[in-house]
């Protein structure tokens, strides 16, 4: 089962993005020919979801490298560093963004050696400089495209491991969108649901709308309908009542950053669901690639939380819904403590509490 749309792709020296701001009303694509357009798309949620942001950042960096100056290796190197810095500042919470920037920097370091050094230098003759920089650009584009291909394969492995947790007939609650729209393809949390369906299991999805930007209503419901997966849309405030009624068998969410103790930053409202799930003995599963795990962080207290514009709460699709001048607090994410999470599903297998040891075992076991 594969999605009938493309979230992100490299086409003819440009980055093709499905405009998720236009969904569900219109399925349209943006062709970004300048890296600034990719940056804007990341910031304004045209492309969103941690894995998709990572791939978009890599492609944006590769795109920007195509127009870096050829005057000297030093100018090229300085321009590349500035380019990476711009993308690293695009959104602060998504670990995959920083992972992608770091990986593109490594690729650059491996191929940028005009004078047999990875340091910025202007020592090489003109023609040799041009050949070297052309090779660097080619390598960066290839790396970004490789990351997109790897992401789809990783998501399929997440689905393979995660679907064993899903029994036939399960009723699954989702939050935000962690599907093909949030990745280069297939999805993390929705990838588990796809894999369960491919294994012949029947499932029913309850998608909560996910205020304030309505990713559940606009994106998850749209994506599941495209796949003919049964989905029922609910408001965020209905989730607890469904659990009380015994109508939810498990909760499946993605993640934007995970600390080594399992504390998980995900779309605002995830923590609320986790507390409700614990009160009703409903398992909550997090599906995310290993690249989302920040091994430098010992707990979720260290995860930076992005705050979004007030307009996201004050308006819906441009229509005001609150009195002018009211104060607004709009964190994009919250952090769910690891002890509320029943399992973290990765491409290397499933980790369970306590996560410090189980996640480390997955890292050690995976190439």
Curated annotation (Swiss-Prot):
Pfam families: IF-2B. It comes from Syntrophus aciditrophicus (strain SB). Substrate binds at residues 48-50, 91, 215, 266-267. InterPro entries: IF-2B-related (IPR000649), IF-M1Pi (IPR005251), IF_2B-like_C (IPR042529), Initiation_fac_2B_a/b/d (IPR011559), M1Pi_N (IPR027363), NagB/RpiA_transferase-like (IPR037171). Disulfide bonds: none annotated. This is Methylthioribose-1-phosphate isomerase. It comes from the Bacteria. One of its GO terms (molecular function) is S-methyl-5-thioribose-1-phosphate isomerase activity. The keyword Chaperone does not apply. The keyword Phosphoprotein does not apply. The active site is at residue 256. Keywords: Amino-acid biosynthesis, Isomerase, Methionine biosynthesis. Belongs to the eIF-2B alpha/beta/delta subunits family. MtnA subfamily. GO terms for biological process: L-methionine salvage from methylthioadenosine. The record marks 176 as: Transition state stabilizer.
């Amino acid at each position: 089962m594969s999605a009938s749309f493309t979230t992100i792709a490299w086409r003819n020296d440009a980055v093709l993005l499905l405009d998720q701001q236009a969904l569900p009303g219109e399925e349209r694509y943006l062709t970004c020919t300048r890296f600034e357009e990719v940056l804007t798309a990341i910031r304004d949620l045209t492309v969103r979801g941690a894995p998709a942001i990572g791939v978009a950042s890599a492609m944006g960096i590769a795109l920007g490298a195509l127009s870096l100056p050829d005057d000297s290796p030093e100018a090229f190197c300085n321009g590349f560093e500035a380019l990476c810095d711009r993308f690293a500042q695009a959104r602060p919470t998504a670990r995959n963004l920083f992972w992608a920037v770091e990986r593109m920097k490594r690729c650059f370091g491996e191929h940028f050696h005009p004078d047999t050094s990875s340091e910025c230098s202007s020592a090489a003759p003109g023609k040799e400089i041009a050949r070297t920089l052309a090779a660097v650009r080619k390598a960066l584009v290839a790396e970004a495209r490789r990351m997109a291909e790897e992401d789809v394969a990783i998501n399929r492995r997440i689905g393979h491991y995660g679907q064993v947790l899903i029994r036939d007939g399960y009723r699954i609650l989702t939050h935000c969108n962690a599907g093909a729209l949030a990745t280069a393809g297939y999805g993390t949390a929705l990838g588990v649901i796809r894999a369960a369906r491919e294994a012949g299991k029947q499932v029913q999805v309850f998608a909560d709308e996910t205020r304030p930007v309505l990713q559940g209503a606009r994106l998850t419901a749209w994506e599941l309908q495209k796949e003919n997966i049964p989905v029922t849309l609910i408001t965020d405030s209905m989730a607890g009542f469904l659990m009380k009624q015994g109508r939810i068998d498990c909760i499946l969410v993605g993640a934007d950053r995970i600390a080594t103790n399992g504390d998980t930053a995900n779309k605002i409202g995830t923590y609320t669901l986790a507390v409700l799930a614990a009160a009703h003995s409903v398992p909550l599963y997090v599906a995310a690639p290993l690249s989302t795990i920040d091994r430098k962080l010992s707990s979720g207290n260290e995860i930076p939380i992005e705050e979004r514009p007030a307009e996201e709460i004050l308006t819906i699709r441009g229509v005001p819904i609150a009195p002018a001048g009211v104060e607004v607090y709009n964190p994009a994410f919250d952090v769910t403590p690891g002890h509320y999470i029943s399992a973290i599903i990765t491409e290397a297998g499933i980790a369970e509490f306590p996560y410090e040891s189980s996640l480390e075992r997955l890292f050690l076991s995976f190439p």
